[in-house]
Amino acid sequence: MSGHSKWSTIKRKKGALDAKRNKIFTKLIREITIAAKIGGGDIESNPRLRVAVSKAKVANMPKDNIEKAIKKGIGGNEGVEYFEITYEAYAPYGVALMIKCLTDNKNRTSSDVKSVLAKGGGSLGTPGSVSYMFYRKGLVVYNLEKYLEDEIMEFALEFGAEDILVSNNEAEVITNPDDFDKVLSLLRTKFKEEMAEIALIPENKISLNKEQAEKIILLIEKLEDFDDVQEVIHNLEIPEELS
């Protein structure tokens, strides 16, 4: 009986992990397809596609899936038109959210986002009400279990990075967006990053206690459960015990 119970638990956990992975792949495929449609299928000349493919590789997406998504984008993606929408919103305790979406149905997405925000104690803001709290920068993230903090700092600054932020065993290298490709190429001669993209960086982060932070994280996770939501950017300082 206990063996059967254990197997059932393993199956449930595996099913949940598979479902989560499939959801991530769906979002990444959509982003790759749109990037290829807008900027072409050449990774070297299409920065957005290059970032999308890099994310897909980090997520261990099969190469065949990536190539099919690019071909679909180049082919025009007939029959489906996606729209890019970024909702500005507030979570409880004044935490700012930028909810980036890719959708083929604006009304559905708007309704879903509003519903989840309302249930989680948040609300939609007006355009410009939240975006001013973030600035656009190049972001390269390294795992400090793999590399020495001092080593990353030394080379990143030498290669032209603007700043290096360290927290929760990660080093975040910040660059001017115009210098991002150059700095990343130089860094790749020394290190392998966990993530690299042009990102929205919060100007200031909000610190909350563990219970409050958990409420915000749950709201963000519920938003990201929707296929239409590609990413939720926030200005919450995640407590170390929750990272």
UniProtKB/Swiss-Prot annotation:
It is found in: Cytoplasm. The keyword Transmembrane does not apply. Keywords: Cytoplasm, DNA-binding, Transcription, Transcription regulation. InterPro entries: Integrase-like_N, TACO1_YebC-like_2nd/3rd_dom, TACO1_YebC_N, Transcrip_reg_TACO1-like, Transcrip_reg_TACO1-like_dom3, YebC-like. One of its GO terms (biological process) is regulation of DNA-templated transcription. One of its GO terms (molecular function) is DNA binding. SUPFAM superfamilies: YebC-like. One of its GO terms (cellular component) is cytosol. Belongs to the TACO1 family. PANTHER family: TRANSCRIPTIONAL REGULATORY PROTEIN YEBC-RELATED (PTHR12532:SF6), TRANSLATIONAL ACTIVATOR OF CYTOCHROME C OXIDASE 1 (PTHR12532). This is Probable transcriptional regulatory protein BAPKO_0024/BafPKo_0025. The lineage of its organism: Bacteria, Pseudomonadati, Spirochaetota, Spirochaetia, Spirochaetales.
